[in-house]
Regions:
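An active-site-proximal structural segment forming one wall of the substrate-binding cleft
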Residues: 94-99, 136-182, 224-231
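Substrate-binding cleft/loops of secretory-pathway carbohydrate-active enzymes
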Residues: 185-202, 212-237, 242-301
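Substrate-binding cleft of secreted/luminal carbohydrate-active enzymes
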Residues: 246-249, 258-371
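Extracellular/luminal regions of secreted and cell-surface proteins that mediate adhesion/ECM remodeling
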Residues: 358-522
Length: 522
């Protein structure tokens, strides 16, 4: 470990001279795998083959820097082709290797797609209302067959879909291996936008008044959005849900949306799909930036909820000239993204965009740098001391779930001998670095290393143990005197490390990082 020791001062404490050592650890450039952030590998992207068909089941993309999550987006029809015949193994088989590595999975279930049927046939046969649409050839250049879109508030459709959600929730709600679930039951691809020829009542048509519902959501669209948001909220109260901007109009020019406010109030995160898909800005007055629309909405979510960004399908847009690697990084900055898609075959994407991916990994999500730590080099057992550390979040996002700072003493064998957790400081308060402005925080952690106590007497158990020939000292010493490595970690309130830091000196694979040495004296 490369550390720089600086003599910072001398403190006299109860007949023991303590030297305060200051260390400024060097930060590394490594890509980190951390909770609630990272790259998403698309095992399924509306299609069973895209983009995991060439990736073996056991391949968890450890070679793709920063890839933390496997994303699976399939139709309801894939998962329940016949009523009650639930094909969860389509998810679970591929999830297992990722879970075994400590990585996560994410899910979206769609009810409408132009590629194949989204809603199972048994729903239509039961009498659910809907309409057939043909995806326009001018959009894709292909002749798609007609597909069926449900009427999203039809009672039969809702009853059948809610039965499916109950079964899905029984399996996945509250599962710590699930990073997030998209609310994906409204609109084509689950993006919240019903087709332009979606059947409306006379009253709903009057509400719309000739306006584009993708720009200015009428009352019927808002009602459907809230209906489906609440449907998922009801069944997944213990899961991080994500809502797409299209639920409030994918081209809505307003600074905020009614459904976006509703989602923030109910702990639902934000997602924007298909960055780089759109025409240049001079052809669309509603988009404030070159290649996306709602980074302003994303920034309203970022302080408290995760933001997920999906790019367009890279192979096509790279050919049409709409892909821009500089904007690839810029969209992460503008959206303050926690998650970013690999919307391509991952190996080829890494080869094509490696330099930009490396830059993104230094900014995506949160990234905690320890800039300086000051600690006493010698401490008496149980003595009150203070460790002062300065931290900077050099990422673009907050660590919204919260995390605690811990200082541990590790012995020569690599065993954790003592751990102190700072219960006053929470890393979710560490603001990200935006527009090159760092917001460091200095944390003063009160510590006591070790605990010594005389064995209480009289005590029947003590008498019985000694009469039986058991030998033990008169004093309980919970931390033996001697030299220890001082390690820092970020994780649970109990001191369990959870977050990787860009530091050298990790003790094994524990996510504890050595910063110096402390001598414990009796």
């Amino acid at each position: 470990m490369k550390v720089k020791l600086v003599l910072a001062g001398v403190v006299i404490a109860t007949a023991l001279t303590t030297i305060a050592c200051s260390v400024r650890p060097a930060s590394t450039d490594e890509a980190l795998i951390n909770p609630d952030m990272g790259w998403c590998f698309y095992k399924y992207s509306n299609r069973a083959w895209a983009y995991g068909i060439n990736t073996p089941t056991e391949d968890t993309l450890d070679w793709f820097p920063g890839c933390s999550t496997m994303y699976m987006r399939l139709t309801w029809n894939d998962l329940e082709p016949e009523e009650g015949d639930l094909r969860w193994e389509i998810f679970d088989t591929y999830a297992q290797p990722w879970i075994a590595k400590g990585k996560k999975v994410a899910i979206r279930v769609m009810t409408c797609s132009q590629v194949e049927e989204g809603t199972p046939e048994f729903v239509r046969m039961a009498g659910a209302k809907g309409h057939w649409f043909t995806y326009p050839k001018k959009t894709s250049g292909l002749d798609f067959p007609p597909r069926w879109e449900p009427v999203y508030d039809d009672p039969i459709f809702l009853a059948k879909f809610e039965n499916f959600l109950k079964a899905m929730a029984a399996r996945y709600d509250g599962d710590p291996n699930v990073a997030f679930i998209d609310i994906g039951s409204l609109g084509i691809y689950g993006e919240g936008n019903p087709r332009p020829d979606y059947p409306l009542s006379d009253e709903e048509r009057a509400e719309q008044g000739g306006r584009n519902p993708d720009c200015y959501p009428p009352a019927w669209k808002t009602r459907l959005s809230k209906l489906h948001i609440d449907l998922w909220r009801r069944h997944f109260p213990r899961t991080q849900l994500i809502c797409l901007d299209g639920f409030d109009g994918g081209w809505n020019p307003e600074p905020d949306g009614e459904m976006m406010r509703y989602c923030r109030a109910n702990g639902i995160g934000f997602r924007d799909d298909s960055i780089f898909t759109f025409p240049p800005p001079e052809k669309n007055k509603f988009r404030p930036y070159d290649s996306w629309c709602h980074d302003n909405w994303a920034r309203l979510f970022a302080p408290t909820q995760p933001v997920v960004v999906e790019t367009c399908h890279y192979p096509y847009r790279a050919r049409t000239g709409q892909w821009d690697n500089e904007k690839y990084l810029k969209c992460v900055e503008k959206y303050q993204a926690s998650y970013l898609s690999i919307h391509d075959f991952p190996k080829e994407h890494l080869e094509s965009c490696r330099a930009t991916i490396d830059k993104i990994n230094k900014r995506l999500g949160y990234r905690f740098e320890l800039r300086e730590v000051t600690y006493p080099d010698t401490v008496k057992t149980g003595e009150k001391v203070e460790i002062v550390s300065t931290w900077v979040n050099v990422g673009v996002a907050w660590q919204v779930k919260g995390a605690a700072l811990a200082w541990s003493l590790v012995d020569a064998k690599g065993n954790v001998a003592w751990t102190m957790v700072d219960n006053r400081f929470d890393f979710k308060t560490l603001d990200p670095t935006l527009d090159d402005v760092e917001r460091p925080q200095t944390v003063k952690t009160p510590c006591r290393f070790g605990f010594t106590k005389k064995v209480s007497e009289p005590d029947n158990v003590v008498v019985w143990a000694r009469e039986a020939g058991r030998k033990f000292p008169d004093t309980v010493v919970m931390l033996k005197p001697g030299a220890y490595t001082l390690c820092v970690s970020v994780g649970s309130r109990q001191g369990t490390p959870a977050i990787a830091l860009p530091l050298e000196g990790q003790v094994g694979q524990t996510r504890r990082y050595a910063v110096g040495r402390i001598e414990i004296q009796p």
